[in-house]
Amino acid sequence: ECTHDYNHSAYYEGNSKEKKYWESYDAISQTQDVCQFLKTQSNASDPFFLVLSIGSPHDPYNTAPEKYQKMYENKIFAIRDNVPKDKIEWAQKGLRGYYAHMTAIDDCIGQLWKELKNQGLDENTIIVFTSDHGDLMGSHGAWNKQQPYDESIRVPFLIHYPKAFGPTGKKSKALINSPDIMPTLLGLTGIEVPKSVEGKDFSPI
């Protein structure tokens, strides 16, 4: 994290050593690139695997596009009970930026979903939404992720796949971890999970 700017990240193409940057807010530019890729997949004979790794929301939180920052500039948020009183103002400021980023990401996910539908891929594509960690945002008097409290380690794990879960979906209280993602995806696609894999296949749940 000392060498990588999550709000202005670099990338490389192919074997080139040239460092490139997206022209606008990372999440928006990356989403546009993904949508361009999806346009090539509507009639493709082979399945595809794609990862969109959005860096935001990430400290510093004041880097979302201006229109999203304005949505929350006067917002007063409900603060968790475990935020010390002397950290409340600090938490309010951070949450305004955090939610600005999250709203931008929400729009990006909506754009992706629209493109999947436009290309007829929405019913036969497994969509996974998750995160590597949460942020404490003032809880326990801390800010980022370095301490293993619930605010840091409990993250969403959402799968959209009507073929497996039906049109209304399902909810589970199962405790899933990062090593379980790959075997679960293999299970959903009917591929045998190698015995050497550490994680568990949760697709039957």
Which role does the model predict for each range below?
Residues 197-205:
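Short, intrinsically disordered, charge-balanced linker/junction segments flanking boundaries
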